[in-house]
From Swiss-Prot:
GO terms for cellular component: large ribosomal subunit. Signal peptide: none annotated. This is Large ribosomal subunit protein bL32. The lineage of its organism: Bacteria, Pseudomonadati, Spirochaetota, Spirochaetia, Spirochaetales. It comes from Borreliella burgdorferi (strain ATCC 35210 / DSM 4680 / CIP 102532 / B31) (Borrelia burgdorferi). The gene is rpmF. It comes from the Bacteria.
Length: 60
């Protein structure tokens, strides 16, 4: 049966556990033009803008 030869250091243990403590990145971002919530790095489906440039003509 496998048994650890040495006690793992605090640094190694905490590094392994740190992945669970990482900050979550928000999946949605507010549109700079209309304020609608949408997927990041995509054209806004409500107004057709992305990075203050209009890419889609959306009839209101």
């Amino acid at each position: 049966m496998a048994v650890p030869k040495f006690k793992p250091s605090k640094s190694r243990s905490r590094t392994r556990r740190s992945i669970n403590m990482r900050k979550k990145i928000p999946q949605f971002q507010e549109c700079s033009n209309c304020g609608n919530l949408g997927v990041r790095h995509r054209i806004c489906l409500k107004c057709g803008y992305y990075r203050n440039n209009q890419y889609l003509e959306i009839g209101l």
